[in-house]
Amino acid sequence: MKLSNEYAWIIPLCPLIASCCTGSLSFFFPRVARGFHRLCALLNVFSLAISMFVSLAIFQEQFVKNPIQQYLWIWIPRSTFCVEIGFLVDSLTLVMSLLVTTVGVLVMIYSDSYMCYDRGYTRFYAYLSLFTASMLGLVLSPNLIQLYVFWELVGMCSYLLVGFWFARSSAANACQKAFVTNRIGDFGLLLGILGIYWTTGSFEISELCDRFAKLKEIGFSNPILTNIIAFLLLAGPVAKSAQFPLHVWLPDAMEGPTPISALIHAATMVAAGIFFIARIYGLISTLPLVMQASSWLGGATALLGATLALAQRDLKKGLAYSTMSQLGYMVLALGIGAYQSALFHLVTHAYSKALLFLGAGSVIHSIEKVVGYSPNRSQNMFFMGGLRKYMPITGTTFLLGTLSLSGIPPLACFWSKDEIIHESWLSSLPLGILASGTAGLTAFYMFRIYLLTFEGDFCTIKTDWVDFNHFAPLSISMWGETEGNLSLNQINQNVASVRLGITKNKGFSSSYLANPNGITNVHYDQSLPKPKESSSAMTFSLVMLAIPTTLVGLLGINLIGETANFELSPEWLINPVHFFELSKSFNIYIKILLNSRSSLILSFFGIFFSFIIYKKSYKYFYITKKLVGFTKLVSKFGLLVQSWSLNRGYIDYYYDICFVRNLRSLSKSLSDFDRYGIDGFVNVIGALNFFGGEFIRYGENGRISYYLFIIIFGAILSSVLIFIFLPFP
């Protein structure tokens, strides 16, 4: 109790101080910051490590006790309206704070090597610490106003980090797209918060759920209005957690540095929407219409993300669509009332996907010295293959993450995903089909990513090359001037780029599925440099993340109920001795696995088909004449899937037609009206005043004869006008 009351405020404060110090040093004294950049990184890692240890200490003390809510000061003191700043410590807060700090520390250690030659090294750490402080402030917020402030800060940090390499037009466009898309959801969230206050008279999370339920019981609240308010509240999580139809920003957000993709767009920020739904779950659980809509929205998003990931060439975008799909699983679980399963999957997925993204960053970091620094090549899986023998640690840890996300026991995501599938079948047959089908697709595309990246032969030395003088690499600002020039000179001495065009073969060959980019002319060049294993800092983070990816799923095994169920307060979580006693019950584990056989069969089918198609990458997969008709059908289906996936389901295309182009036309029309209408009218008035003044100015010439002439002329003209227009009696 003492730790929670006195030291909980330290958790977000430490990274905030580190961010302010690093950012100020980088802005005001850039040369000093470049000279002491490693000390800046150490400061940020140390500050977040303090937050992690404080979170762990409070976790051990407070996890099984009642929630604590404490306010530090009053922000807006009014008699009728008062907003206070404080913190709320409960089991949900503690789990999220541990998740953010543990993943954040490992990402910072990883980034020290990944970003070491970048000129924005200290700026990167300042942004990273600011994000972790904002995220920790969000999960500790006791009221909706404080939560919304940190919600917007998290979005701002995402904007800064996605556009970190803002000199690249693709990164600049991606951060703007993410910002605008999230503004749509955040505006709905703000309206929902105001509607909650208008309905309940409170912003306090601990009060509004009870007040909302009481108002509904006595019939005081309007059912239509309450549903509208709840849907507005869900608009924020829909955008932040990349749910359909506001999911379009997430794949483009991969333009940021890969450590950011691991922390923000896989483990923490995109999970903020799930956290918010869980935080107000007592409110939305009383509204059946909202719950049903959430479940179907989550199911549709899960299936859509899985289908969009099936044929991606970009390694990071494939993982991004996978993240979108798994977030849909969580929203589906919350919509059907599987609250604990959703939170369990949030934790297991966060560690697994952070491991996968950092593994992808390790691959990209190594291979771009071979193929160049353009993301179109260094992130293209068809330039990879066979990397496991060059990068054994990265390959092994990536395989663990792949198996976990595919739902293979005893790894983490198996337990949570299986429970969600089980609850989906109990809730609704269509939702059960959606969840199960998505599980099979997940296993397929995850092993497709693994096989194309790590198995087979290194494809870069087996492709048709052209001279670098005709196709120079695109260097990005990830590397400093010296290292970048050295690396480019090294690559320029090699032969250069891969031909990505899809060749049209006259005869059918199913090798198109195994060799999707259509490269048929193979040239072996053994003189090219080979990828190497990443530095110890990067592999250390991978190994440390592999531990929770393997073991954290065991937290959710309810051995009494013999089902996978996320208990937020298991006794052995505080006393590890209990865990080793319970782990001896192998019969119960076997029963759980037998109950999960349907989802396991789907996962193994997905893995099996992935092996059939992609195991022999860049080798022809010959077939007998008897199967030609079937394989032609499969080929046509494969082309449809590829077109659907590479064109992002055509959703961005129709958004561009229906919204972007119309908004641009409207904005151009309004701009022309403002320029030629409003500004034109003002400019004409100004011009008339100017020329009128000039005309009058020439009348002041100082000649008495001229003045006398004007007076006489005016008198005569006035007399004539009076004589003409005024009748005389």
From Swiss-Prot:
It is a multi-pass membrane protein. Its main location: plastid. The chain crosses the membrane at residues 9-29, 39-59, 87-107, 125-145, 147-167, 184-204, 218-238, 258-278, 289-311, 327-347, 354-374, 395-415, 425-445, 540-560, 592-612, 627-646, 676-696, 708-728. GO terms for cellular component: chloroplast thylakoid membrane. Pfam families: Proton_antipo_C, Proton_antipo_M, Proton_antipo_N. The keyword Nucleotide-binding does not apply. Signal peptide: none annotated. Keywords: Chloroplast, Membrane, NAD, NADP, Plastid, Plastoquinone, Quinone, Thylakoid, Translocase, Transmembrane, Transmembrane helix, Transport. InterPro entries: NADH_UbQ_OxRdtase_chlpt_su5_C (IPR002128), NADHpl_OxRdtase_5_subgr (IPR018393), ND/Mrp_TM (IPR001750), NU5C-like (IPR003945), Proton_antipo_N (IPR001516). NDH shuttles electrons from NAD(P)H:plastoquinone, via FMN and iron-sulfur (Fe-S) centers, to quinones in the photosynthetic chain and possibly in a chloroplast respiratory chain. The immediate electron acceptor for the enzyme in this species is believed to be plastoquinone. Couples the redox reaction to proton translocation, and thus conserves the redox energy in a proton gradient. PANTHER family: NADH-UBIQUINONE OXIDOREDUCTASE CHAIN 5. Belongs to the complex I subunit 5 family. This is NAD(P)H-quinone oxidoreductase subunit 5, chloroplastic. It comes from Adiantum capillus-veneris.
